[in-house]
Structure formats: C-alpha cells, structure tokens
Amino acid sequence: MAAARLAAALLLLAAQVACEFGVLRVVSQTSRTRSRDYCILYNPQWAHLPHDLSKVSLLKLRDLSTTQLCSYLDVPAEDFTNQIALVARGNCTFYEKVRLAQGSGAHGLLIVSKEKLVPPGGNKTQYEEISIPVALLSHRDLQDIFRRFGREVMVALYAPSEPVMDYNMVIIFVMAVGTVAIGGYWAGSHDVKKYMKHKRDDGPEKQEDEAVDVTPVMICVFVVMCCFMLVLLYYFYDRLVYVIIGIFCLASSTGLYSCLAPFVRKLPFCTCRVPDNNLPYFHKRPQARMLLLALFCVTVSVVWGIFRNEDQWAWVLQDTLGIAFCLYMLKTIRLPTFKACTLLLLVLFIYDIFFVFITPFLTKSGNSIMVEVATGPSNSSTHEKLPMVLKVPRLNTSPLSLCDRPFSLLGFGDILVPGLLVAYCHRFDIQVQSSRIYFVACTIAYGLGLLVTFVALVLMQRGQPALLYLVPCTLLTSCTVALWRRELGAFWTGSGFAKDAPQTPWAATQGPVPPKAVGSSLSEQPPSEELAKSPLSTEEAGAADPAKDPDNPVASPLSPSNGDEAQPIPVVKPETSA
C-alpha cells in the first residue's frame, strides 16, 4: 500500500506544471556595492537554478523589454552572448521565446509580465531541447530596478534552498492537538452536567444548547453535501468564496461567544438586565455583560473580515476564531456510538483520498480539487482564500520570503472529524469510570497521526490529506483499548448513552444519579430514569433544597425541612397509577 501511494504521488507530481520561486540579484554596473533582490517565478524543467549565490556569475542584463521576441526579426544584430535577455510577455509561447534567446547565445531569459506570474510551461520534447533557465519577473519589479539602478545592471539568477522543516509546524501541532483535547473533554463533560445538580438558574441565557446526535443518515447526507459543495467551489470559486467567508464570520463569532460565555458569567460586574420589552431575544432580558460579550465577538469577526488579507497579523485572528468554532462544534455535535464514529471517519477518509489523489486524473489541469480549493485556484480573479483552515506563516528566515509569505495550513475537518471520536471516548470513559483511558489514548493517537502527516509532508513536499493518517491512528487505537479492556461490545454500541445517566468519577459510588432539574415534577421525569434507587446524602439534600436557599422563596415538597436525610422518592411506572 505504501509503495502504491508513493507511486500515485509521483504520478501526480509529473502531471503538474512545475513551479518554483527564485531570486534575481541585481547589482549596479557602476557601483558593485549597491544590490537588491527581486522575486522571480521559474520552471526547473527548462533548466535548474543553482542554490548558492556564490557559485553564480554576474551577467549583463540585455534590456529588450519593449520586444516580445517571437520571431527572428526581434533578435538584435548583436547577439545575447554571455548576457541575460529581458523581453516582454505575449504573442507567442514561452518555448518560442527561449528557443530564439538560446540560439542567440543567451545564458538565461527573463520575461516581464504585467499580469499575474504563471509557470512558464512547455512539453517534454521542448524541455529536452532547452538548456538555459526561463523565469518571469513582474513589471512592477522591473520599474523599481530601472528607478534604483538605471538600465545598465548586472544580474544573477539563483534559487536558495529552504529548510525542510519549519517551526510553524510546532505551532500548528499545539493548536490542533490542544483543540481536540479541550474540545473532546468539554464535550464529554457537557453531557455529564445534564445529569449533575445545577446551580440556581440566573436567567434564560444560563441554559445551554442540547447536543445534536448524529445518525447514519445524517452522515451520508453530510458527505454528499461536502462533495457537492467542493465541486461547486472548484468551478465557481470566485463567486462562492465570499459566501463561505460570510458563513465563517457568523459561525466563528457564535463559537467565540460560546467559549467565552462560561467565563464572563463568573465576572462580578455588569449583572444588571435589560428592562422588560417585546423585542426578539431581548424579551428574555439578557444580562448586560452577555450583550457586551456578543458585541465583542461580532466585532472580532468583522475586524477579521475587513482585514483578512493582512498577512502580517490577520492569521492570528483567523486561528483564534477557527479554534473557537471547532470547540463549539465539538461541544454541539455528538456521535452516540463508536459505530457512528467509524462510519463517519471511514467515509470522510475515502472522501479525502479521492479528492486529493484521484481527482487530478479527472481534471483538465491535472490539479487536485481539494488542494485547488484549499489554497485558492491559481487563475482566481479575487485571489481570496477559504478561511476554514488554521494557518501559520513560515518562521524560518529565507531569501524567498520576499516572493510570498507562505503559510502552512491545516483544515478544520482534520480537527473536527477525529475530535468527534475523542469526545465520544471521553463520554464513554465517564460512563464506565475508566480514568479517561480512552480519551487519553485517542488524543495521543491523534497527535501521533498528525506527526506522521508532517513527516509525509516533508518527504513528499506536497499537500497531504491528513485524514489518511489520522483516521487509522485514532480508530485503531480506540478499538485496541476497547479490546484490551474487553469492552468492545459496549464501546461499539455506546451502552445507551442517550438513555442512561452516566456514573461519573465526581459522584459517590453508591449515590444516586441526580435529576436533570431541581424541584421538577415527577411527571417531567422519564420512567426509564430511576431517580431514587438510594437515599440522597445530607449534603446533596441540602444543596437541592430550595427551602434552604434564602434567595428562593419557593420550598419543594419533596425535600425535608429539618435537614435530615431525605426519603426515597417514589417512581411512577407507566403501567401503574400513582
């Protein structure tokens, strides 16, 4: 399998037009101490550029930037011997230009482009015929060269090597593993709190949203929608990208609010509420601090939306909003069984491989649909990028940093999909009281899978479908732990997560499962929840007794008023009358 994947990767690389950045060193012909570097785009299939500047000779730049060099009539009487030819782009192919330049003795060809730089491509026969480098230079950079140095300059073309490993991978690793661990822990604990005693309700905004259980039908519909949306983005990227940006702003601000709300509710100030009114949402009289939090979250999202293309700092806001969105989704979406986890991960595993490795054979350009959409099509007129990724700029210093500010990317799907399995493992840990062994093992497996992804990225030097490595690592690890503990059957079916209240490490071993809401009537409790298998302890009875709360004037008839141990509460069976 490994050999087949490597062969497929090599085939894909061969099918694409090679494209690399290089550096043009410009030196003044009158003063050799004055120099400046400029970015160029070249195709190494014509000829490779040396990596070391010290091994490159400075050559005179022959300025024919007003000529397109498409016929022998464009070749000057004095040839290009020991010179770098500078010509304009257009009217003929790159091959025709470089063939004429090489025939006239040029040691290299620079093509000035007023449009976006594209790889100077050709075919295999043409590559074998040409032995001099071909590179594109932007018209803006050429104007800067003439302004600074004049038209008499010496130049050298080279392609400095970049470090194989960049430190930004460490940042992405910490963000991804941290999000999965925190999100999985939060999602599991969120389910437990529904069965634990609650503090006095301070207002309507105190209530938390219920988790959404994912069914196999929902999984299939979701994957079909993903495929459909990805294909639409591939063909209509420039129109749909703004829709995705708008959705991200809305969803990320909601996620940020959900993450910060528990901390804001603990603040001792701004607890006043809005006056009585009939306005939507405001009729619930939210607290002033929650309104301020909502305003803050919307402001952060809007600021990112306005300045999203500021490479120097906008990526920090994007990552912050992205992590908040992922945490919110991990808390909200719940996979009820390991069977559902396996189905989702395997289907998306196939989806990821298909759109990364198979689609290059189906598209005219020979490019992967997934990579094109994730990084933005090269022919996009908007040059916008999809925000559904964590992105960190390269931290290693390199001369090539003047060409672009390259980012390393990790899609939200590579966090959310394994994260849902981690969340399920935490809930199962709580149910079987296993000291979180499933949760810890699955989180470690995710981290190891991500490390394998980074290694593959370094070795293959191209984008990797992270789920190709994350899905086997997390699924096999979780299954192995279940087999080792002889709990595979219960782990596979979830053992009634949706029905039974979990026995948590924080509850007494022989104690009861507390009701969902203090003081609720018997008719509100499902018959399947045996609420009173054993008496409440004195501490729990006191905490659950509204009569002992000086702020609550309503006393519950189900709680003793003398502080003694509460008596068991009778359970009404559906087939008998009370």
From Swiss-Prot:
Catalytic residues (UniProt): D352, D414
A single cellular component GO annotation: centrosome
Top-level EC class: hydrolase
Keywords per UniProt: Cell membrane, Endosome, Glycoprotein, Golgi apparatus, Hydrolase, Lysosome, Membrane, Protease, Signal, Transmembrane, Transmembrane helix
Topological region Lumenal: 20-168, 238-239, 308-312, 363-405, 460-463
Stretches in topological domain Cytoplasmic: 190-216, 261-286, 334-341, 427-438, 485-578
Any GO BP: membrane protein ectodomain proteolysis
EC numbers for this chain: 3.4.23.-
InterPro entries noted in UniProt: PA_dom_sf (IPR046450), PA_domain (IPR003137), Peptidase_A22B_SPP (IPR007369), Preselin/SPP (IPR006639)
Domain PA: start-end pairs: 61-145
Compartments where found: Cell membrane; Golgi apparatus membrane; Lysosome membrane; Endosome membrane
Membrane topology per record: Multi-pass membrane protein
Membrane spanning residue stretches: 169-189, 217-237, 240-260, 287-307, 313-333, 342-362, 406-426, 439-459, 464-484
Signal peptide residues on this chain, from the entry's feature table: 1-19
GO molecular function: peptidase activity; protein homodimerization activity
Biased composition (Low complexity): 520-529
Family in the record: Belongs to the peptidase A22B family.
Function: Intramembrane-cleaving aspartic protease (I-CLiP) that cleaves type II membrane signal peptides in the hydrophobic plane of the membrane. Functions in ITM2B and TNF processing. Catalyzes the intramembrane cleavage of the anchored fragment of shed TNF-alpha (TNF), which promotes the release of the intracellular domain (ICD) for signaling to the nucleus. May play a role in the regulation of innate and adaptive immunity.
Assembly information from the UniProt record: Monomer. Homodimer. Interacts with ITM2B and TNF.
Domain notes: The PAL motif is required for normal active site conformation. The catalytic domains embedded in the membrane are in the opposite orientation to that of the presenilin protein family; therefore, it is predicted to cleave type II-oriented substrate peptides like the prototypic protease SPP.
Name of the featured protein: Signal peptide peptidase-like 2B
